[in-house]
């Protein structure tokens, strides 16, 4: 694809525009409702009509908790800490897990169940579980399966708190880690695997450098060496990339970013096979990092507009990246769907669009970056991303400040690096603000 050309979300190389971007087997209207679950199919019965696969836009809207006696059209908020038993026998059977049902909102709640069901469907997973935050989800995705003496191989380019988890916290419990560069060969990844290695952990694209990792290659390695592949899919959402298609066992999201899309609530989610999620459910039930029903209700509503928002995020980000790619005040511009990006071919292979993040390096280093941040007028200066509002962040002094200078250099975080989360404003207004901030900070 030529630099600057656009691809609509959902399009694939060689696929018609209306082809569902689902992975695994096609999902149908009947698949929205699972027998003996609280989910129902809110589409009129079509049992006498041909079954057809549903697109993610439809699944994100039509997957809902079963209607109550009031026959509400929109899922209500279930603000309750616990649920009433019909009788003593039901209480016993629920706690022994002989029957399914709600007991306590730390274990399950109709709102969290609906949100998780949607995320699992969008990622092509069997099951999932919601967490109080993205980092709680990252921690749980490994802590539930690792023990003292185990080893993790991770991509070197990681979010700052994830890096701290591997380097500062896990070693306290006897869990060691090794890092591999994102652009390393398959042989280099294989060489990092030890007899004690249990997990491969990556984020792609990486935060903040937008390095991509070949998920198909890692999926083969995980299968060959019987490892669990965990992928942080936060930057792309399941609308743009489905890691389980390439062999991932668990997919992790910080839901407070693009999933929410408006910077309102905290949340995280992990999806995967029913067997792995059962182990994770035991972990969360007895350690407590559960998502609140209110946050789940907000996030489930947010998923209804995710594909529409991601379309605008991506088209705006591509426009911003293209506009500034040759700018005289910048040393580089990184965006996966620019032909100049090192991993452009890989982006076309495993992502259906380039995402909503653009990275710039300003000439003038740290002081220039500070002046730029102080000069923006429209864009928000905050450490979040994935918002409808465009956001600028300086990773060196914020999200990755706990890394040493040498560690930052290793993953390409230089003093002049600015991460821009491109929002849904008119693209000309976003470009104007970046232009005037560059001029004023010169």
Regions from the PLM with identified roles:
Residues 31-109, 117:
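N-terminal "arm"/small-domain region of PLP-dependent enzymes with the aminotransferase-like
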Residues 288-289, 376-386, 437-442:
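A common structural junction motif
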């Amino acid at each position: 694809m030529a630099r600057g050309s656009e691809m609509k979300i959902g399009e694939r190389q060689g696929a018609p525009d209306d082809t569902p971007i689902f992975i695994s087997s096609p999902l149908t209207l009947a698949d929205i409702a699972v027998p003996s679950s609280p989910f129902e199919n809110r589409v009129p019965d079509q049992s006498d009509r041909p079954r057809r696969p549903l697109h993610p836009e439809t699944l994100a809207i039509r997957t809902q908790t079963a209607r109550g006696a009031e026959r509400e059209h929109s899922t209500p908020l279930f603000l309750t800490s616990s649920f009433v038993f019909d009788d003593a026998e039901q209480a016993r059977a629920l706690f022994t897990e002989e029957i399914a049902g709600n007991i306590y909102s730390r274990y399950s709640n109709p709102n969290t169940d609906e949100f998780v069901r949607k995320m699992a469907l969008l990622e092509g997973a069997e099951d999932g579980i919601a967490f109080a935050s993205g980092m709680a989800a990252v921690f749980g995705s490994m802590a539930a399966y690792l023990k003292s003496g185990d080893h993790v191989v991770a991509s070197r380019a990681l979010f700052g708190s994830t890096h701290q988890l591997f380097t500062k916290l896990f070693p306290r419990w006897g869990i060691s880690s090794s890092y591999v560069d994102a652009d390393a060969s398959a042989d280099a990844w294989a060489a990092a695997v030890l007899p004690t290695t249990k997990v491969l952990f990556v984020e792609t694209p990486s935060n903040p450098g937008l390095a991509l990792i070949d998920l198909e290659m890692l999926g083969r390695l995980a299968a060959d060496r019987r490892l669990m592949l965990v992928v942080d899919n936060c930057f792309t959402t399941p609308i743009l990339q489905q890691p389980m298609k390439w062999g991932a066992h668990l997919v992790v999201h910080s839901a407070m970013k693009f999933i929410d899309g408006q910077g309102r609530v905290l949340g995280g989610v992990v999806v995967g096979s029913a067997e792995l999620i059962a182990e994770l459910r035991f972990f969360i039930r007895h350690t407590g990092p559960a998502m609140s029903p209110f946050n789940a209700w907000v996030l489930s509503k947010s998923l209804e507009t995710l594909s529409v928002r991601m379309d605008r995020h991506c088209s705006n980000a591509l426009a911003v990246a293209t506009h500034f790619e040759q700018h005289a005040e910048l040393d580089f511009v990184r965006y996966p769907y620019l032909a100049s990006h090192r991993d452009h071919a890989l982006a076309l292979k495993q992502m259906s669009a380039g995402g909503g993040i653009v990275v710039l390096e300003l000439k003038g280093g740290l002081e220039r970056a500070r002046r730029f941040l102080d000069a923006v007028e429209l864009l928000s200066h905050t450490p979040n991303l994935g918002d409808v509002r465009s956001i600028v962040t300086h990773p060196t002094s914020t999200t990755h400040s706990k890394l040493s200078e040498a560690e930052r250099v290793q993953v390409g975080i230089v003093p002049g690096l600015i991460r821009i989360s491109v929002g849904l404003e008119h693209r000309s207004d976003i470009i104007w603000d970046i232009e005037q901030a560059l001029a004023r900070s010169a």
